[in-house]
Amino acid sequence: MFKLIRRFISLIFLAIIAIPGYFYAQVWWGAHYPVTRSSDYAVVMGAAQYDGRPSDALEARLEKAFQLYQNGLVKKIITVGAGAPGDRFTEASAGREWLITKGVPRKAAISIPIGRNTIDSTIGYVDYLKKLKVNEVVIVTDPYHCKRATYIATDKGVNATCAPVQRGPYSLDRKSTRLNSSHT
């Protein structure tokens, strides 16, 4: 009987370590080895903006999307994200204006001011894409956010790949395992 109890406790202990370890490894792998393909649309996930000026995190995402646009990997860029109560601008509008000032045509920079989190923002842009009968997208976000963002998009019916940022406060060069843990 004691042997059976010890085996059961060992299995529970193994599960406690293995399950979070599996998810941690999935997030880490997606951050370090992204699969990015061309698409008609890129979606820049929202991040803070300060009175219309993108935060460092949002600017890094916008730069990556602009790079994809310049290289011909995407034809249009969607920015998403609502504003906080009292904000004069939304994350989406601040991002769109940044892209336009860099040379992206107004028709190619689309603002969807929906969502203060990944799920709500994803629902907003997926609804927009479905109206256009588009089902593929490249998501531009932080490396450790890629797995979550692509998983939610796929769950909502869109084929998604991720183009993680290479610089910025949440990029891989910061080597932040703390951040990795918070995005699992």
Regions from the language model: what does each represent?
Residues 2-34:
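N-terminal type II signal-anchor transmembrane helix
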Residues 24-174:
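A structural signal for short, hydrophobic/glycine-enriched beta-strand patches
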Residues 177-181:
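Conserved small/polar residues in nucleotide/adenosyl-binding loops
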